[in-house]
Amino acid sequence: RQRQMCIRDRLMSTAVASEFAHRLLDAAPGTRFLTIKDDGSTFASQRGYAELTTFADHSREPSDMPALDLDEVLDGDCLKMVARHPDLPIEELAARAASVGMADEVHVTTSGKPMLEISARGVTKDSGLSMLCDHLGIDRTDTVAFGDGANDVEMLAWAGDSYAMANAVPLALAAARHRAPSNAEDGVAQVVEQPVGMKVL
């Protein structure tokens, strides 16, 4: 049977991305930005961004990232924008991002890496899971979610059942109904093995 994939893009407009970026620059001078466009394969990085990142952050070599002017980075609607700062801790950068007053237009979160992830309002993991369930005809009560980062919070709260990993951030621990062993202990596999009585290799 032919497989089908259901994709719905909810893009952040150039105007919104530009407004947020410039407000954040006012609040945290020196912030560097990257935008992810098209199907997620196109990265537009500001000059100086690559020096702040590693392969693990985006699954690509920093040396392969372009060094663009900010106007070029912000040119065109994007799936997501990433912001990072050479000196400020991520908690401080997040606090300054929250102070710019655009919560009605953007969603700002973190994933455990030293960078902010900014998307259009309503673009969260729970909205993606909800779309997938609608497409597949799966009831929300039949879903189970696992997470460890701040960007998992909405999904953990939305799912019919949810587990935060033992190494999760406090927000994720508070949002989940249960705890799972840590990522290092293969916590997801341990939980999944229990009801089905089999080993996940």
What positions do the PLM features span?
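Short acidic-hydrophobic, aromatic-tinged amphipathic segments that line or gate anion-handling sites
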Residues: 13, 66-68, 179-182
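Detector for glycine-centered tight turns/loop "hinges" at secondary-structure junctions
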Residues: 8-9, 40
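Active-site-adjacent loop/tail segments of enzyme domains
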Residues: 10-18, 22
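Short, small-residue-biased leader/transition segments that mark boundaries at the very start
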Residues: 2-7
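Mg2+-dependent phosphoryl-transfer enzymes with acidic/Ser/Thr/Gly-rich catalytic loops
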Residues: 117-201
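Conserved acidic, metal-coordinating active-site core of Asp-based
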Residues: 23, 27-146, 150
